[in-house]
Amino acid sequence: MTAILGHNFIGGARSAAGTLFLQSLDAASGEALPYRFVQATPEEVDAAAEAAASAYPHYRQLPASRRAEFLDTIAAELDALDDDFVAIVCRETALPATRIQGERSRTSGQLRLFAEVLRRGDFHGARIDRARPERKPLPRV
């Protein structure tokens, strides 16, 4: 598994301006685990919101096929998380590995489902009413 730095990602770059740290704990024992995460500062939160707002117009212009690719890529990355990830989450939550693996699969499955909706265009809500000349009392044309 990749080294856990505990930094925030803002606009595609790491940021760790905060001075407060959140310590990862073993849920069963309360023992500190070797992972600390920098708590974002109010300025970092603002910067993250601004970065998201400025990325939105570009993302909105992407064709549905590219958005579907994006969701499929996230799903693949989630599925690629190995047993080390599952073990850490089990310690932090006191949940069994099967639950964590199930949640991971459910999440990646939902991302793939939404990707398929994008590919099919279901979100447009388009309906095609075929002509029915035999329809009574009036034909649909």
PLM-predicted stretches and their roles:
Residues M1-P137:
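N-terminal Rossmann-like NAD(P)+-binding subdomain of aldehyde/semialdehyde dehydrogenases
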Residues P139-V141:
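Donor nucleotide-activated moiety binding/catalytic core segment of transferases
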